[in-house]
Amino acid sequence: MKQDHVNEEQSALWNGPSGRAWVDIQPSLDRLFEPFATLLADAAAASSARAVLDVGCGTGAVTLEIARRLGADAQCTGVDISARMIDAAHERAKRSGLRVHFVCADAQTHAFVPASVDLIVSRFGVMFFDDPVRAFANLRRAARTDAALRFVAWRSALENPFMTTAERAAALLLPDLPPRRPGAPGQFAFGERQRIAAVLSDSGWADIAIEPVDIGCALPEPALNDYIGRLGPVGLALQRVDDTTRRRVVETIRNAFEPYVQGADVRFDAACWLVSARAPSSAA
């Protein structure tokens, strides 16, 4: 970690159990979030960008899809705090034969080459900074004048009941389950439009647009047990309980997800923000 101990909690999480889980069930998660990879890749393909930075790239799905769209002369780089996920991204890149670059680093503090990219994207990767203004100011320095910023982030927990189903169903069986802290780094840190606007404005971005989007997503039904048992606050809590409790919790949560099961898939609508902004000149 950096000497000022930035994002230590998130680094421990994503270099530990959460990172392992994402790597292990990567194909299912890729399918779950594929509509958002397509959304960002479409935006990249419609732009004139030739140097793209994917923030919080995870195992590389978005970075690789953009590289496919833009062709061999584009420079596509993914950055993530999780060494385990970056290792998986490197392996995917080798198999794909695509020309991409992955960096294990904290985008909040990493010394990016100044004015080196003309498009910055992120699929659910920018809600985890402990100082988001500092993070987006750092990304702004990496951007060339008039570079575009495009990212998707979750709207509020209230608007995303699927994402809190496990916590609500397990609450009585896991009384020590930590509550989500409003505004804290995590999935719903950017749930409020006003906060996103303030963060981007305070960090030097211009022409900010924040659009609500609702997109249908699907998870293969056989992957539901891993989704329940390994991801999110419940997944972390289940590592600390005995086998009997774990079985009871998973069974209870699976029953709570039944309304979302449609044949071979688990389906839900994701309530998100599609955010765009522009990097003004340093003199602006």
Question: What residue ranges belong to the model's regions?
Answer:
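A short acidic, Gly/Pro-enriched loop at the edge of an enzyme's catalytic core
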Residues: 108-119
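Conserved catalytic/acceptor-binding region of the Class I
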Residues: 133-134, 140-141, 148-219, 238
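A short SAM/SAH-binding and catalytic strip from SAM-dependent methyltransferases
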Residues: 118-132, 155
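Helix-to-beta-strand junctions that scaffold the AdoMet/dcAdoMet cofactor pocket
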Residues: 71, 129-130, 143-145
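Conserved hydrophobic residues forming the short capping helix/wall of the S-adenosyl-L-methionine
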Residues: 70, 93, 170, 200, ...
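Conserved Class I S-adenosyl-L-methionine
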Residues: 3-4, 13, 18, 25-26, ...
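Conserved alpha-helix/loop element of class I SAM-dependent methyltransferases that forms part
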Residues: 31-50, 65
